[in-house]
């Protein structure tokens, strides 16, 4: 369903496939992978399917709409909980070239991706299809450029882990030995 969120935590292993069905028009989506810390890599997998009506929204007086997928914005909490990275995940649709301040926890790394129109982020122009890494700070200022179209972006922030990352195919672990064990488990039907 348009506007839905699928949130999967792979943990010790999760085999899945995605086969979205398109009725008409253009279908698109965002796929985001968030690393787990070493202590959580072998947790049981879990899956959450969140329909659009269960994603809270904040609407400002000037018509800006903020969908709160994870974390908290303007005292509204998103439906995703219990994630070690303590993510902030917002879908922001700016109304009428308006400006919006978004607080970012000082403990988090963050990025923004403009998926419609173009926006200014802390004074820098970001065009459609561009992703920007955000520097440290307590907040960013987002401003739309157009009064005739919807300038939109996703903003994601999360607490970084000071741990090594080893990746091979679909596996992400902390050591080469853990990768070898994950491959062994997958080949032997243990996930």
Residue ranges of model-derived segments:
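Jelly-roll (double-stranded beta-helix
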Residues: 1-191
């Amino acid at each position: 369903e348009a506007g839905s969120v699928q949130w999967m935590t792979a943990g010790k292993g999760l085999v899945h496939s995605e086969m979205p069905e398109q009725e008409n028009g253009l279908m698109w989506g965002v796929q985001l992978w968030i690393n787990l810390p070493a202590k959580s890599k072998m947790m049981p997998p879990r899956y959450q399917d969140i329909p659009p009506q269960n994603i809270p929204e904040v609407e400002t007086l000037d018509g800006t709409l903020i969908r709160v997928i994870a974390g908290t914005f303007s005292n509204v909490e998103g439906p995703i909980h219990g994630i070690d990275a303590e993510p902030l995940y917002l879908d922001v649709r700016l109304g009428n070239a308006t400006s919006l301040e978004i607080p970012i926890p000082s403990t988090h790394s963050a990025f923004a991706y403009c998926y419609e129109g173009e926006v200014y982020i802390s004074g820098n122009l970001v065009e459609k299809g561009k992703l920007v890494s955000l520097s440290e700070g307590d907040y960013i200022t987002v401003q739309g450029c157009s009064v005739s179209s919807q300038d939109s972006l996703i903003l994601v922030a999360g607490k970084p882990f000071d741990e090594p990352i080893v990746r091979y195919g679909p596996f992400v672990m902390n050591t080469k030995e853990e990768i070898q064990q994950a491959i062994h488990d997958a080949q032997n039907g243990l996930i």
